[in-house]
Amino acid sequence: MTEEVIVIAKWDYTAQQDQELDIRKNERLWLLDDSKTWWRVRNAANRTGYVPSNYVERKNSLKKGSLVKNLKDTLGLGKTRRKPSARDASPTPSTDAEYPANGSGADRIYDLNIPAFVKFAYVAEREDELSLVKGSRVTVMEKCSDGWWRGSFNGQIGWFPSNYVLEEADEAAAEAPSFLSLRRGTALSNGQGARVLHVVQTLYPFSSVTEEELSFEKGETMEVIEKPENDPEWWKCKNARGQVGLVPKNYVVVLSDGPALHPAHTPQISYTGPSASGRFAGREWYYGNVTRHQAECALNERGVEGDFLIRDSESSPSDFSVSLKASGRNKHFKVQLVDSVYCIGQRRFHSMDELVEHYKKAPIFTSEHGEKLYLVRALQ
């Protein structure tokens, strides 16, 4: 008979998804599946669900190797097939998954265009899945209530576990501590004597996921003191309070090289207006080669909800981005130019004008709560 494995909760955790389980510090749990970053456990009330593996520790036995692998070796089991759900009705090839499913017909939300931050790396196991790179951004195009979302990254489209990402469009998630936040602002070291590589300003709020990471609010100025070679998507920074930790580099913009200036002398952002050169020169909504940070500043300084601008993509020279003024947080949507067709999410347009006119009448963004955003007018 296979020995039961007991794990002890190291911290409290509140479930964020239907497939997850609330746990309390020092609670005893039975380990059912440890084959993923998230472990499936059972509590004393016989409820089962997934919890972050770094929130629990083993109490007995099987400390080496995977519990699932040991069970498979013992019982000769193969892969467990996920019960059919709405995801299997996707036009893309259906697959089996080893990730939590509700076991019943799942609801789907289509035609989304929501940016999301990748919290954990994920390697696609099937042809219709999407590999995720920690610290990168993906565009969520479709949601299925079985715990899987469909999105795009670097021109690839596929399914991935929803709790591996954090929606940037979710204002509550942006303003509250992230679901894996441990101790905010935990310092790796005091950073004394470290050479300052850059001075950066944060573009968005961020809550630490691990003890090595550094939490911050939008608009903070920090010093970059190290760029780890083994984790190029993250920079080691020191904030104004002397706390040091890792931050996602695409959450900051470089203001200058070298030591920080006095806070009262933070560089000012010059006026940003429509571009007189570039693909759409002369259009009132085309701002050309401006950064996301400059677009944010312009929208915040002069815009009202619904104002928008279109700019050249920073990551792909031939593509574009739509920046939209919204309550709480501004929204940014990537527009890919493929064979003279403008693609935003799953929709395609023959011209940028057609795209703009479409999203003046149809929502460019719809939240899970029914909030709809439109392109109202070009930023003045």
Curated annotation (Swiss-Prot):
Adapter protein which associates with tyrosine-phosphorylated growth factor receptors or their cellular substrates. Maintains low levels of EIF2S1 phosphorylation by promoting its dephosphorylation by PP1. Plays a role in ELK1-dependent transcriptional activation in response to activated Ras signaling. This is Cytoplasmic protein NCK2. InterPro entries: NCK, Nck2_SH2, Nck2_SH3_1, Nck2_SH3_2, Nck2_SH3_3, SH2, SH2_dom_sf, SH3-like_dom_sf. It comes from Mus musculus. The modification N-acetylthreonine is found at T2. GO terms for cellular component: cytosol; endoplasmic reticulum; postsynaptic density; synapse; vesicle membrane. It is found in: Cytoplasm; Endoplasmic reticulum. Keywords: Acetylation, Cytoplasm, Endoplasmic reticulum, Phosphoprotein, Repeat, SH2 domain, SH3 domain, Translation regulation. Interacts with DOCK1, LIMS1 and TGFB1I1. Part of a complex containing PPP1R15B, PP1 and NCK2. Interacts with FASLG. Interacts with AXL. Interacts with PAK1, PKN2 and SOS1. Interacts (via SH2 domain) with EGFR. Interacts (via SH2 domain) with DDR1. Interacts with IRS1. Disulfide bonds: none annotated. The modification Phosphoserine is found at S90, S94. The modification Phosphothreonine is found at T92. PROSITE patterns: SH2, SH3. The modification Phosphotyrosine is found at Y110. One of its GO terms (biological process) is lamellipodium assembly.
